[in-house]
Amino acid sequence: MSEVLPYGDEKLSPYGDGGDVGQVFSCRLQDTNNFFGAGQNKRPPKLGQIGRSKRVVIEDDRIDDVLKNMTDKAPPGV
């Protein structure tokens, strides 16, 4: 897990001129290798696999009629 640590005393600076206002300090992440999760160790997809999805099941009883009507009619302007 990453730890959030301040840069150091030299990076600390007062905020504004008021005496009651606290100090603002910057933080940095230590060990950012695992910051984005374990998915970074996966290999990239091959070129033929990009854009392909798994099987999709369409559960609509009217899908045959809709697809049939789309192929029967030519879109306007063609």
From Swiss-Prot:
Residues 41-68 are annotated as: CAMK2 inhibitory domain. It is found in: Synapse; Cell projection, Dendrite; Postsynaptic density. This is Calcium/calmodulin-dependent protein kinase II inhibitor 1. It comes from the Eukaryota. Potent and specific inhibitor of CaM-kinase II (CAMK2). Plays a role in the maintenance of long-term retrieval-induced memory in response to contextual fear. Modulates blood pressure and vascular reactivity via regulation of CAMK2 activity in addition to regulation of left ventricular mass. Mediates the NLRP3 inflammasome in cardiomyocytes via acting as an inhibitor of the MAPK14/p38 and MAPK8/JNK pathways, thereby regulating ventricular remodeling and cardiac rhythm post-myocardial infarction. The keyword Mitochondrion does not apply. GO terms for molecular function: calcium-dependent protein kinase inhibitor activity; protein kinase binding. Transmembrane segments: none annotated. One of its GO terms (cellular component) is dendrite. The keyword Ubl conjugation does not apply. Interacts with CAMK2B; the presence of Ca(2+)/calmodulin increases the interaction but is not essential. Interacts with CAMK2A; this interaction requires CAMK2A activation by Ca(2+). It comes from Bos taurus (Bovine).
